[in-house]
């Protein structure tokens, strides 16, 4: 702004100075027209002496043209100032539009980044949805397999439970039967053992009684034998006659002793047999006890089998409960996956909605960018129209200058033709703008002073005139000013 104000004041100073305006006119139109300005002015002044009416008309015409040019110049200045102000406004608006465009471009880039991010998130969510669907299908397949396996396990468990019940029932029946048999056999063995013990005790008692009797008999026999021996010894002398009888009796006694020995041996054999029978009974009793232990061990094994079957039943029930819990967990997982799938679908819908909003915002921004571009093109178009208008006005001014140059050339030609006629009297001064006719009888040598005076007066007001501010000079200055404005606009 400071530079433009400086340039404006600079050109105003140049327009105020006649020499500078003539220099500008020389640079624009050429040196020929401006160099001859004084000569034209002088020619016009000399022409007025020869033909005052034509000079008056020419001066009036130049005054009107000068007035029109001044008016046009003022209008052009005003319009130039307005155009400058409008140009400044357009520049400010253009800067604002550029700033707004940059902001919109930044927002557009941000929205593009958001769109790319949303697209990436959308692709990620689509992949997650696909993975979730794949996992859901896999879980459905696994759930179907687990359901089939669960049904199969339930069927097997039911079969095992039925089989376990049947086995348990059979084992219970077998155990009860075995226990009853063992108890019956044990009772029978106990009764047999009791009977055998009674028989053994009775046999032992009988054997002991018989042995005691045999001992008593042997003692008695020994006593008898001793008494007999004593008697025999005492009566040996006395009973020598009865030796044969005694020998016979001794033989009988020996035979009785042998019989007693045989009886004693038989008793020993019976005792040994009873002891053997007792050992056999004890062995049989031990065998029965071992069988009882075996039956007890079998009963314990059956009890263990029963406990194992019950434990297996409990394990099967626990497995069934575990499978039911796994089924519940899988059902809950399936429901969770369904919820996750619904949530992912909802998120996908939201992402698509956000993407649509972003696309709509992006479209609005693109539309706004297009409008900005169009407005920019429109301002450039208005600027071009303004420049074309200024160039057209400058061209019109140049055409007017050309016309004035032609008229000046005609005036010069008229001056050349008038120089052949007699001069007017020098005593009568021609005052331009008042319509005074020159007096007759003037001498040719008296026309230098009026020429100097008319050079210093304006045609209409009679004021002292600057030769540089003639109509041609003003036209040249106006044209130069317009050309300078156009040039500055082009540079801007």
Curated annotation (Swiss-Prot):
C repeats (start-end): 251-285, 286-320, 321-355
Sequence repeats (start-end): 69-75, 76-82, 83-89, 90-96, 97-103
Localization: Secreted, Cell wall
Segments of skewed composition (Basic and acidic residues): 71-115, 249-354
Pentaglycyl murein peptidoglycan amidated threonine modification, residue list: 461
Entry similarity comment: Belongs to the M protein family.
Region (Disordered): 71-131, 235-354, 408-464
Source species, domain of life: Bacteria
Primary location group: secreted
Region (5 X 7 AA tandem repeats of L-K-T-K-N-E-G): 69-103
Short sequence motif named LPXTG sorting signal, residue ranges: 458-462
Signal sequence, renumbered to the chain: 1-42
Propeptide stretches in the record: 462-492
Source organism (scientific name): Streptococcus pyogenes serotype M5
Keyword terms: Cell wall, Coiled coil, Peptidoglycan-anchor, Phagocytosis, Repeat, Secreted, Signal, Virulence
Cellular component aspect of the GO annotation: extracellular region
Protein name: M protein, serotype 5
GO BP, sorted A to Z: phagocytosis
Stored InterPro entries: LPXTG_anchor, M_anchor, M_repeat, SMCR, SMDRR, YSIRK_signal_dom
Membrane topology: Peptidoglycan-anchor
Residue spans of the D repeats: 388-393, 394-399, 402-407, 409-414
